[in-house]
Amino acid sequence: MPAQLLGDHVRFRFTPADAGVTGVVLQCDRAVPGGREFRRDADRGGWVLDVPRPALQRVEYRFAVERGDDIEVVTDPGNPVTVRTAFGDRSVTEMPGYAPPWWLGAPAVPGRLDPHTLSGETTHEVPVTVWTPADLADEDPAPLLLVHDGPEYDQLAAVTAYSGALVAAGHLPPHRVALAHPVIRDAWYSGSPQYLRTIAAAGLDGLEARYAVRGRVVVAGASLGGLTALLLGLLAAPRVGGVFAQSGSFFQVRHDDAESGHRYFGRISRLVQSVLDMRHAEQPLVVGMTCGALEDNAANNRDMATALHRAGHDVTLTEVADLHNYTAWRDALDPCLTDVLRRVWDHGG
């Protein structure tokens, strides 16, 4: 049976197919309140766990099923609703009122995907796959959106489906989406000066040599990719006119002790502090940010939005009732990314 919302709590149930189960533990984000260990249900058999209803639209979870010293991590066999994530499949329970974005089922312009590589200062070339509306020729001028973690953003957050649907609906002009591949993700997406300079200079030069780019570029990303999008925007302005950062990893010593073991935490926190300390923007950006109100990055995203606004950037931070995952990022693309794209591309873009 899928998880049930029963008034002020959610009930999870696990009915094993064998008698050897000795314990069941709920695996989910710590933003979900309550305990994690199931109890035996003497009345109905199996195992049951009640947790307070979280202030979330969706909960992604798995079960850790114990058989003595052996532990098997599984999706909920009683729940047919699952989601692909960057870390494997998860079961999902959706709260009343949740709905996927309208554009997922809407008509969309077809597109084509063309692979490229960008060369510069990085030790490895940067692979980039460019999505283009099928009826848009390479020499036709069109705006450009560059997305970090591009393949995952497309597979798990449907970013090119979003673009195709928004173009078909007339909400966005025909545009191209450059999906950047994270070959050495932690190194590149932690403020690597070589990576940032590669994309800001030779990378954008290469894309503009291949395609007719109209106006200012918008760069996007999530988590470490959100940090990278912001740093790239600050470096490459005014060539880059807009930034869209989702759940950006704007690590600070005072907020993010849990991340202090990250290999590049020192570099990230120093770069973040330098942005927080800025008082004036020579080239103001349009910055859209989204973050789960209950996720670990919420405090550092609020600080970053405040600092960017103080420096003169045009900033909108939208907090959502979800967490650090691609479905949350997908669900916030419209209107949050749409607003950034329209404002950059309609005014000098």
What are these regions (language model features)?
Residues 1-35, 41-349:
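Non-catalytic cap/lid and distal C-terminal segments of serine-dependent acyl enzymes
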